[in-house]
Amino acid sequence: SRVLSKYYMKNGYELKISDVIGLGQRGGGVESHFRYSTKRVLSPFIKAGDVDYLLSFEQTETLRYLHCLKDDGVVFSSTFELSTSSVNTRLEKDMPESKTELIKQSGKKTFIIDPEENKSPDFDISKMMNIVMLAIYAEFRGYPHDEMIQIVRESVPAKFVAGNLKAYEKG
């Protein structure tokens, strides 16, 4: 959300952001509500059914928040899966269905990103899925490539710039 916020601020939008971090070890999620507009934005929170775009780095999280999307909302999801703590402790069974298939069956326009597809011995893309997904989202939205590259360059610590730019190009 930090990189996107810089893009929107540079382009004259008002924005509000809220990060909600649940207790992951207890099955809680992490979510960022991000609203921008040319008009005044009063609250960062978006009610269920009003979300335009869902970007998710883990499939259970994608399924958890699918209901928040508008009918014509768009999903960007990684293929990465984590078992919940209740599955790990055998209190519950994991879903037998493919989570990717369930996401696709939602009827939403869906982009599934597989970090394994671009893995190489010298570059672990899974560590930078946020930047890969940002690049895919920015391309989908038609944001200027050069401007986004510059914002990524300005947004990450110097020692991580090269890796993040490589991840952006992979996206």
Residue ranges: model-predicted function:
Residues S1-K170:
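Active-site cofactor/cluster-binding pocket
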